[in-house]
Curated annotation (Swiss-Prot):
It comes from Homo sapiens. The keyword Repeat applies. The modification Phosphoserine is found at residue 42. SMART domains: EFh (SM00054), S_100 (SM01394). Keywords: Acetylation, Calcium, Metal-binding, Phosphoprotein, Repeat, Vitamin D. The lineage of its organism: Eukaryota, Metazoa, Chordata, Craniata, Vertebrata. This is Protein S100-G.
Amino acid sequence: MSTKKSPEELKRIFEKYAAKEGDPDQLSKDELKLLIQAEFPSLLKGPNTLDDLFQELDKNGDGEVSFEEFQVLVKKISQ
């Protein structure tokens, strides 16, 4: 996935994975894993593990990643 996507495209990608289980406005850890494996596979090849990445993104500690929290990941990888 190119990080040069419009906000609308990023929202659509987020919603595609968030709708797989539970709250359609939040990514569970499993949904985040599927999204990263499909859209950002290189993220899990370095020192970052899925657990570390999930903890970093889940700023409010609710066990899920909102679209706002997901945008942190997009900004991080587009730098």
